[in-house]
Every structure is written in structure tokens, then in C-alpha cells.
């Protein structure tokens, strides 16, 4: 996407197909913001969501610009695996990076309007109503301790002298004069872990030098106008202003981003089986093609998995059984256990720069 404005100020409202971004878009119109509307297309949304985006665009009376990425499926094929809970690269590659690329092409001061609410998750409860978009390029989004793993190992009741911790133990002895057989070892490690030289700051880094140069001339701020709203307030606001939310909510889905998400609940899987069985079949084929499973190990109880492997626990040295569930296994389990009835809560992506919904 090339430059779309050279005006001094440029408001952007992110539209995902979900209720919160829809309410934010309506709020912008009612408050005379007149933003450019952007939809980051992962090419993994449901057809109902794509239809919703098209209809919402007509109702808004303003174009919704589609930002394209490599797409979820092509990204997974390229990496030869699906995203996972520990390697959740999907949001960054499919939404955050295309958005940053787009921002850096603009010659304007930008204000981004995000549909994020405090009650959605613990992570979002800590967000501010107004912020700087590139904040976590210049201050850490989290700080960890160099010896966190040793402390966790001790807290779990295991001896810290594991292969994973060997280098850390040597560092403790050399730099901090702490040995594993010292009295009050845990207390000493905890104190050492809080020393400035043992604190590790984590920053976002994608195109950092380009961002630094861009920020010499322009700014990029974030506004979250509905951050304090409840879910009822969101739906009521949409309907009271003459709009209808994404039809997937009527079908029982609570989140309507990637369809399905690798972090979706078993209730959500049941809904996909019911409404989009062809998507389930497609994922089965992708699993075979990539020799990778869509869901993580132990997503369902091990005894229900067709593939079970032995894994040596790094902390105890003991071997344990870990189930690797195929989509076929998950479907059988979900149907056998009666998932999908009643309300359920979706999972939440944690990226600070761009919400999944």
C-alpha cells in the first residue's frame, strides 16, 4: 500500500470484522474524526466476515482499505508449521508488520483508533486510553530476570542443576559468588536476579531504524475510545446507531478474527465443525502436507491422541507421555465430549501494536 495522504494529520481506524473495531469505527463517524479505515487481511477469516466488511463499508459510506500480507496459509506453508502458543508469529507477520509498513509510507502525523477494551483480558486491562504507537521500541514492553528459569525450577521443587541451567549456574558462581550448595540459595539467587545487570529488557525491533528516521518528522499516536466499555455497551452502541454486528456472533462465536485461531477453545472448534466443516477438512489436508498439527501438544488428553511421543522432562530427567493431536483427534474428542453448547470465552492475542479483533 502506497502513500494515501500528504496532509499534516491522518486519522486511521482499524477494522477487523469484530464488534469492538466496528463500535470504534461508528464512534469515529459520530465524533467527526473522518478517518481512513484499514482492514488487515490474514486471508484466514471466514466468508461471513468478508461479507460483513463489504456491507459495513457500504453502510459507512467510506472505503475500507485492505492491507494484504502473505496470508495465514502461505505463511504456515513457508515456515512448514502452524503458529503455536510458544511461537505465535501470526499476528506479527500478518497484521503488525503490514501495518508498520503502511505507516512508514505516509507523510503525515498519524492517530490510530483501536477497538480495545479493558475487560477483554488481563493484558489489555493494563493498556492506556491514549498512547504512542511505537512506545515499545523505546521502552521495554516487559523486563525479565536472567535467572528466572532457575527460580522457577526451585519453586517447582526441582534441583536447579539441569542442563538448561548449567550456564546460568556458572555465571552465578563467577559473577555473583553464589554456589548451588550455599545456604539460602534461593534467596541469594532472587536477590541477584533483581540486580540491574541481570535485568533483561525486551523491545520491538521490526524496522526500528526506519521508524527512528520517520519519527524525526512525524508522530504516531493511539486512541482507544471504547477502552472502558462493557461488551453489552458495545453491542448496544452498534445497534442503537442503526448497524448490525458480524453475523458470526449470532451463530455463537465470541471472536470473529482468524477462523479458526490456533488458540481457539474447544467450544469454538465445535462451532466451526457445525458451521464450516469444509474448513476442518482443509486443515486436515494442510496438517498432512506440512507434517504439522494445527493445535498444540496436550490440547486434548493424551489418551485421545493418535500420536503419542516420549518427552524427557528437562527439570526432573523423567520421561513422560505427550499427546500430539491431529485435527481428526480433536474433532472426535470435541464431539464425544459435547462441546459447543452455551456461551464460551475466546482466547486473546497479546501483541501491543495491533489487536486480533
Which residue ranges define each predicted feature?
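Nucleotide-activated chemistry modules centered on ATP-dependent adenylation/adenylyltransferase
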Residues: 1-357
